[in-house]
């Protein structure tokens, strides 16, 4: 009986260590958001100015101040998660590694490496390469010319930034959902695709994507949410099972 109590206490302490990692990560996201809040206006201003559009023929406008505030807070949260994610995945790796076999350690490390390192890199590519390229491309395609004069164009800054926010949330939520589902299968919590945990994870993913997408994606929210869930579930089924 004493042995059982010791084992139970050991498991409790082990679980408490995992909860501590999650708690510190959440605190890190809050602190990073507070820090970035002092610079978010400058970051957005410099990013908009970095778009290689003809300065004489375009104007950025904000048609809804409240949407602009929501946009800034969404960006703060996305950037904060990207900053803290490497720390979180590193701590989780150190937490779980002692209880895994060598083959399991390799897969586990690669999965966390993808989530903790690749996501921030992809977010950088989206915001500083892909999105500016698309904005500049569609600006050139859609520019209206009248005689020798080019008609001045106005761009809604919130709508442009919201495009990147939507893609960022899809990437972050979809990748983390895939990771959680893969870990559930990896540790035997999901067998033959039958598990309440799997269904709950998919429902949470669907709800998060549906609620986090900006108004720019109205009309596509449900479709995008379903595709994200289906993609995450399909990729997680590739998880190797070591016996």
Regions found by a protein language model. Give the residues of each.
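Membrane topogenic/interface segments and analogous intrinsically disordered interaction regions
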Residues: 1-243
């Amino acid at each position: 009986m004493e042995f059982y109590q010791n084992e139970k206490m050991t498991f409790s302490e082990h679980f408490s260590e995992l909860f501590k990692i999650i708690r510190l990560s959440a605190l890190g996201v809050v602190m990073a958001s507070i820090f970035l809040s002092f610079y978010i206006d400058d970051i957005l201003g410099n990013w908009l100015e970095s778009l290689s559009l003809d300065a004489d023929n375009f104007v950025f406008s904000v048609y809804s101040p409240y949407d602009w505030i929501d946009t800034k807070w969404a960006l703060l949260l996305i950037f904060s998660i990207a900053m803290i994610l490497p720390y979180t995945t590193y701590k989780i790796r150190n937490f779980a590694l002692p209880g895994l076999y060598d083959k399991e350690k390799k897969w586990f490390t690669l999965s966390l490496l993808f989530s903790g390192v690749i996501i921030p890199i992809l977010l950088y590519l989206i915001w500083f390469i892909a999105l500016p390229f698309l904005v500049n491309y569609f600006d050139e395609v859609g520019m209206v010319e009248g005689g020798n004069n080019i008609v001045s164009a106005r761009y809604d800054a919130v709508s442009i930034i919201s495009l990147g926010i939507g893609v960022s949330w899809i990437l972050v939520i979809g990748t983390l959902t895939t990771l959680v589902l893969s870990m559930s299968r990896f540790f035997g919590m999901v067998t033959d695709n039958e598990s309440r945990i799997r269904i709950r994870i998919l429902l949470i993913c669907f709800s998060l994507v549906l609620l986090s997408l900006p108004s720019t994606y109205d009309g596509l929210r449900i479709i995008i949410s379903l595709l994200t869930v289906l993609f995450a579930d399909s990729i997680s089924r590739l998880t190797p099972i070591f016996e």
